[in-house]
């Protein structure tokens, strides 16, 4: 049996086991997916511990996505650029790090038929979640990428390696019609379901609204967007997509789209 798992600090309500167990079943993989709750005292021994336990692959979540990087032998191009690893592969005694949030975001857009090349994207929020999204948009030849934050100067230093523009929320109020608006902030996430990062006036200026929040599935941001005629995309398929990509890395397989869809539909019923 192959052993896999999720590494983090507080993992009580993770949906990851359901995603991975479905992939195991559909691909005849004899696998076991565990939750590994790691105290901060042991954060410097994560990869060595995985090797000792015989773990083949692991997902990494808050607060260890950055801290685990210096423990790895090889880090993928996208993970280096993003500055975070959320997937580890242990193979032939070596450890490899990847960022499958990058691919999960791509799968989310592909499924929703949102074209990137030649279009403009405005990203709300400058936390860790924004980095994988900015990198994917950059690599996919978006015409214009704008990072919207409360402190433009501070964020410029943090994201100076990206080929993007910077804007404050006040400046966002003054823009004209653009293509897509992406929420990467926790605004609207349960239990703060009434919060939204921008006004309806701003939302109306876009054609597409995407939210990486998936609980609830339709956030206040997406509801406002839908009511104003925008195409809306929820964040659940990004979660599914990043998990599926991890399985492809760990097991050297190509997961069928029907499996991704079935996982999405099963999880959707939860929210």
From Swiss-Prot:
Major enzyme class: oxidoreductase
This enzyme's EC code(s): 1.1.1.25
Residues where NADP(+) binds: 125-129, 212, 235
Domain of life of the native organism: Bacteria
InterPro entries in the cross-refs: Aminoacid_DH-like_N_sf, NAD(P)-bd_dom_sf, Shikimate_DH, Shikimate_DH-bd_N, Shikimate_DH_fam, Shikm_DH/Glu-tRNA_Rdtase
Residues annotated as binding shikimate: 14-16, 61, 86, 101, 214
Protein name, UniProt field: Shikimate dehydrogenase (NADP(+))
Family assignment from sequence similarity: Belongs to the shikimate dehydrogenase family.
Catalytic activity: shikimate + NADP(+) = 3-dehydroshikimate + NADPH + H(+)
Annotated keywords: Amino-acid biosynthesis, Aromatic amino acid biosynthesis, NADP, Oxidoreductase
GO BP of this protein: amino acid biosynthetic process; aromatic amino acid family biosynthetic process; chorismate biosynthetic process; shikimate metabolic process
Gene transcribed to yield this protein: aroE
Alphabetized PANTHER family for the sequence: BIFUNCTIONAL 3-DEHYDROQUINATE DEHYDRATASE_SHIKIMATE DEHYDROGENASE, CHLOROPLASTIC, SHIKIMATE DEHYDROGENASE
NCBIfam families reported in the protein's UniProt record: aroE
Active site: 65 (proton acceptor)
Pathway(s) where this gene product acts: Metabolic intermediate biosynthesis; chorismate biosynthesis; chorismate from D-erythrose 4-phosphate and phosphoenolpyruvate: step 4/7
One of the record's GO cellular component terms: cytosol
Function as written in the Swiss-Prot or TrEMBL entry: Involved in the biosynthesis of the chorismate, which leads to the biosynthesis of aromatic amino acids. Catalyzes the reversible NADPH linked reduction of 3-dehydroshikimate (DHSA) to yield shikimate (SA).
Subunit annotation: Homodimer.
GO MF terms held by the record: NADP binding; shikimate 3-dehydrogenase (NADP+) activity
Record flagged with keyword NADP: yes
Keyword Oxidoreductase: yes
